[in-house]
Amino acid sequence: MRRGLFARPSPTTPAETGARFGFEYLPADQSYFDSACQTLRPQPVVDAMNDYYLTYNACGERVQYAWGRKVDDKVADARAAVLAALGLSPKRYAASFTLNTTYGLNLLLNQLPSGRYRRVVTTHTEHNSVFLSTMAFAQRTGVERVLLNRGTDGALQYRDDDLTDALVVVSAMNNVDGTATPGLSELITGTQARGGTVILDAAQAMAHGLAHLRGLQPDAICFSGHKVYGASLGVVAATSELLESLELSFLGGGQVSAVTADAYTLHTEPHTRLEAGLQPWGEIIALGAALAWVDGYRKASGQDLATRERRLAEELHDGLVALPNLRLLSQRGSSLVTFVPERVDAHRLATFLSRAGVMVRSGYFCAHHWLVEQRQLPPLVRFSLGAHNTSDDVARAVDTMTPLMKGL
């Protein structure tokens, strides 16, 4: 039966996978290198979302009829899949769904207990989702804001005193050069031992460094479904203790079990603290399918996803590093291959590449403070790889870049 956004059946055996396992719908003459912004969606994820809209499109967590109960089961499965992917215990953590990573971070930072923290700690290298939300937190609460430097290996440079009664918000993987943040376990345990709270931005790490996250026990992890092969969605996996401590100012249906003229009673389930109103049920269900697809990639395709991505990243790095008139900022093997183009504007170069079917990101990637104020760099070009990319994509990119850069 042919059904779904792309009207193509999902592959079922390794023999049918080809080079673009899960992405057979993609045109051969187009190469997408912007997975750091949002990944493309494998066919099973599209099928799962379409199946919801076509066969049981109902509200969840508030109805008794069959379609709604099926939604309940699928959403519960997605919550469990989030915690399982991160290696978090459902006895201590709960998964809430929201708009995106930025929204999830702001929901937390705007509702944390007043007077709880002495300072907020982050780094100079953060995405605006962290950099601006921590800035606003400090301005609103009047606490000190500490901006940490990173070493050449990405390690955070801090004193133990910085962590005392601190709200620490940092990324697990940088979105400019793909560097994973080392020493997160020590940062988390050190902060928590000194009465602080740690929130991780895992938007990049979920798809490109999940092994780096597993085993960590922060107070909250925020990420986006659309960066890990799911639909557009935000996720907050937080301790029940943190969620129950929030001073809620964003309220609505789905959070309460009783309401009177001047009071309300909250549901006992901690995940509801961040879920005011109806949720994007189809997107949540698609996230569950995406996490299952990632988890089952090796068995279904015969390849290890991380190894495959690293090999392609090395091919791309090696092809670009040999070219003149560009300065690479990322390390070999990183899923992000970012460079400063010399003698040509980054946006113009991205336009030229697009005409040849090569789609890349140009600009500052929401890291304006670090790249502009601190490093005084011009706009950059970023290739970011995903599960859909192939050696043919890399060859097309390098073959297109070569005459452009040599002709400058």
Give the residues covered by each predicted segment:
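Pyridoxal 5′-phosphate
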Residues: 1-408
